[in-house]
Amino acid sequence: MSIFKELKRSDHPRVLGAIDIFKYIGPGLLVTVGFIDPGNWASNFAAGSDFGYSLLWVVTLSTIMLIILQHNVAHLGIVTGLCLSEAAVKYSPKWLGRPIIVSGFLASISTSLAEILGGAIALQMLFGISIPNGALLTTAAVLIMLFTNSYKRMEKAIIGFVSMIGLAFLYELILVDIPWETALKGAFIPSVPQGSLMIVMSVLGAVVMPHNLFLHSEIVQSREIYLKGEERIKKMLKYEFVDTLFSMIIGWAINSAMILLAASTFFAHGEHVSELAQAQAMLTPLLGNNAANIFAIALLLAGISSTITSGMAAGSIFAGLFNEAYNVKDAHSIIGIVLSLGIALLVIFFLGDPFKGLIVSKMVLSIQLPFTVFLQVSLTSSKRVMGRYVNRKSTTILLYFLAALVSGLNIWLLIELIK
């Protein structure tokens, strides 16, 4: 039985309205965590420090792409009652569905590696702890949180983490002077300054992550409302869209804040930033110790929260192989979580240069993502799977276009990484 069965109907009022929409908010924010993970931090600070406000539009475009794809995969979970992994097992040929799910699980390990490293880097900034020991502490903290808390508690914790990250960047922005007219132009008027193509491609190609597609289709089922049949599905689809839109806008705001901070400090002083530790160290003389420490704390929260969601996604993917829903008390979900985080931790410990692991991580994600995205679109475009809620032809065309675009960007990034 899914862990989401713990959400009793008595938790929800019978009258549906604005308050119910507010109470529905949650699954999208867990997905947003993957949108503001340490990997995105690195890309955003590189974009802001090298090209000022001119690449803010990339965050806007990537957010629109993410809203469309995440909204679509959430539909799969609501209509079928299955996560992407379960749906692939049920509706795809064995020779196709299961290999894609296994590759998705490998991608979740790669994601966990990057997220754990983010937490470890933050601990090194704050306390001087070595990267391996910081990775061990981050992993241990995440495992304890996952195995000692219900989904509802974890959701509240993640929402709290995202809120604190947002407040941290709001504080940082108060300390700097931003030419808002220039920033607004950068956010909505595309431009590609000379030498910026690699960063543009990196941000656009990395925004959609395989584990988030699996995760969203699972956790959207945590919501129940006092309706049945078609009326229930219609209402949940509307509520889900509000949740996804609201959550992705928050992700857009936080990512934009990173570029704004980098542009107003590093770019304004002609400083190039290539690593997060370098960014934190350079904030001290520019904005003071408080700004640097808050930066590190926000990174730690991002690392922990994104490791939690990557672990949950791994549990969902692995359980789906056995046609089971995610349940943190179920053996297959537990095995998926432990394998994903454990293998990622071992790679960090035994790799001579842990940051080479990030390159390997990006390569694995670039190879796997096209399979997951095309699997998702094929399932949601199938009347056998979705019934009357199958994608419209225009929606299918748009989704396949986005799938091809994201796949092309990731293949291009893979070639660049190999070079």
Regions found by a protein language model. Give the residues of each.
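Hydrophobic alpha-helical segments and their helix-loop junctions in multi-pass secondary transporters
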Residues: 162-189, 204-220, 375-384, 409-418
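Extracellular/periplasmic helix-exit of transmembrane alpha-helices
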Residues: 65-79, 220-224, 229, 249-278
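Hydrophobic transmembrane alpha-helices that form the core helical bundles
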Residues: 75, 97-128, 135-139, 303-322, ...
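Flexible loop linkers connecting adjacent transmembrane helices
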Residues: 3-10, 43-48, 71-96, 121, ...
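Juxtamembrane transmembrane-helix boundary signature
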Residues: 31, 58-90, 99-110
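Loop-to-transmembrane helix boundary motifs in multi-pass membrane proteins
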Residues: 94-95, 132-135, 246, 292, ...
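Transmembrane alpha-helical segments of multi-pass small-molecule transport proteins
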Residues: 101, 126-148, 164-169, 327-346, ...
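Membrane-interface "cap" regions at the ends of multi-pass membrane proteins
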Residues: 1-39, 94-95, 199, 235-239
